[in-house]
């Protein structure tokens, strides 16, 4: 029931025109997910477009000098994200012809990729089942299941991961993942949530 409500909402109201939703592949998803860490979509959009214009493939990113990569990141903040992108691009290009692994554990061995980013690459990039738990999803799940407690608390976080795993479907994976993030970003907002629009 939860998944159906989320997917029905997405078909009607979800965001489907973001640049990383076009020509989908693990590389494009990975860059977008790293840029979106701690950063709003509206801020990321121009950076993503410029970054992809200069580095349309992981091989192009790997071959670029680090200072050029950092110039493309200038203004986005959290600069270790850009350094990790470059390191991972070089590693994958050197060791696997630029091909991403599609298993969570293997993805998490790469610089700057945690459990949620790995889940996003798997679900959005490969369209394979991979739960995610970013800030938006935490908010949706904690309100839906009435989970109290600080997200940084390990018990609270474990409970949220339990529900993230439980609710992630085996079909329509890419759509569900995008949908639950969208609901958290546009409806179940931190401040002034639009509860009347909640599916």
Where on the chain are the PLM-derived regions?
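Catalytic cores of DNA base-excision repair glycosylases
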Residues: 2-196
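Cys/His-coordinated zinc-binding microdomains
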Residues: 199
């Amino acid at each position: 029931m939860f998944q159906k409500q989320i997917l029905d909402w997405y078909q009607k109201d979800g965001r489907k025109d973001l640049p990383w939703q076009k020509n989908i592949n693990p590389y494009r998803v990975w860059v977008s997910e790293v840029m979106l860490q701690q950063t709003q979509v509206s801020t990321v959009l121009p950076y993503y477009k410029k970054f992809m214009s200069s580095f349309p493939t992981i091989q192009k990113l790997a071959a670029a000098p680090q200072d050029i990569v950092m110039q493309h990141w200038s203004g986005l903040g959290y600069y270790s994200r850009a350094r990790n992108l470059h390191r991972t691009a070089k590693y994958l290009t050197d060791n696997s012809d630029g091909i991403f692994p599609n298993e969570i554990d293997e993805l998490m061995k790469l610089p700057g990729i945690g459990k949620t980013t790995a889940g996003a690459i798997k679900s959005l990039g490969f369209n394979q089942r991979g739960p995610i738990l970013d800030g938006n999803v935490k908010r949706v799940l904690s309100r839906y299941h009435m989970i109290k407690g600080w997200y940084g608390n390990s018990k609270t976080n474990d409970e949220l991961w339990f529900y993230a795993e439980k609710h992630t479907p085996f079909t329509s994976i890419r759509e569900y993942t995008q949908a639950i993030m969208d609901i958290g970003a546009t409806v179940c907002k931190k401040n002034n949530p639009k509860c009347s629009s909640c599916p």
